[in-house]
């Protein structure tokens, strides 16, 4: 979420923010479906596996989690008469508001009409989240004195990740269909960018879908994609954690990314070919333009 905070800061303060360069790792600029799972059922790749009523209550009362709601074109597939806009309260299951109402009833300073208070509070959290995300989407780097080459944007790929959310109506209630088949990984490491079409964007780091990690203030050609296979030979513990806990949480530990960040902030050359990355799906050959100059394209053999 740090990348979202940095983008919000730059939008608010512009060139007064005194920022020269930024690096963001697996930031859900367009959201993550794991935030929906955490709010809806109390589980997901943003935390532990076993859902609990206490965890659901905490998630539903946490404003920051609503800032991670996904807004990816075509990814929320709503049934007839239902909204696909998850920043609208009507798109959500009623029990979310009911949980907030119970919290107000037990812990509110004025526990009068808790359901009405809960509806206002839920709508307010969604509206604030939508407004913030809108400001991030409309960020203009030049207003902050920056160029695309000043922002290193790293996205994790080649891990099964939830890339869509079907919504259906059931007995007058909204129902989120949380299906394992909606976790996909169509990334193909054997195909170079010339053959890697946008469909291979149906991947991610296990938590953030690739399409959720591409900010609107940068182009796809500016994104650096990394995979779990980029862990070094001796990063044995990190490889184990990747399999056990997912790529998203362990991605910042990758030695190669540390070297990449140092190169970005210092402008130092790569004398030994120790930093690399991959172009994003849909980027034509020769158009990859990452922030770090002369970054080795891992897709190009030899």
Predicted regions located by residue number:
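Helical cap/lid subdomain of alpha/beta-hydrolase-fold lipid enzymes
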Residues: 11-302
């Amino acid at each position: 979420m740090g990348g979202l905070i940095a983008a919000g800061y730059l939008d608010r303060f512009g060139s007064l923010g005194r920022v020269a360069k930024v690096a963001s790792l697996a930031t859900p600029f367009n959201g993550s479906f794991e935030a929906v799972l955490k709010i809806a059922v109390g589980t997901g790749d943003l935390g532990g596996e076993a859902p609990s009523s206490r965890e659901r209550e905490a998630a539903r009362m946490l404003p920051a989690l609503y800032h991670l709601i996904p807004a990816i074109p075509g990814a929320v597939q709503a049934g007839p008469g239902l909204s696909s806009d998850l920043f609208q309260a009507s798109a959500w299951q009623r029990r979310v508001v009911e949980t907030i109402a119970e919290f107000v009833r037990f812990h509110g300073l004025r526990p009068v009409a808790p359901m009405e208070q809960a509806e206002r509070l839920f709508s307010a959290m969604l509206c604030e989240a939508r407004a913030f995300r809108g400001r991030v989407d409309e960020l203009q780097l030049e207003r902050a004195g920056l160029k695309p080459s000043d922002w290193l944007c790293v996205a994790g790929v080649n891990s099964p990740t939830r890339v869509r959310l079907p919504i259906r109506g059931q007995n007058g209630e909204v129902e989120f269909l949380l299906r394992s088949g909606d976790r996909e990984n169509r990334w193909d490491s054997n195909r170079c960018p010339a053959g890697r079409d946008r469909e291979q964007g149906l991947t991610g780091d296990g938590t953030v879908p690739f399409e959720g990690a591409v900010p609107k203030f940068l182009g796809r050609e500016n994104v650096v994609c990394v995979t779990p296979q980029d862990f070094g030979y001796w990063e044995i513990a990190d490889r184990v954690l990747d399999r056990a806990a997912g790529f998203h949480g362990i991605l910042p530990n990758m030695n190669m990314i540390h070297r990449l960040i140092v190169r970005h902030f210092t402008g130092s050359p790569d004398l030994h070919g120790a930093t690399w990355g991959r172009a994003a799906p849909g980027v034509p050959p020769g158009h990859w333009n990452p922030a770090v100059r002369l970054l080795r394209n891992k897709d190009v053999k030899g």
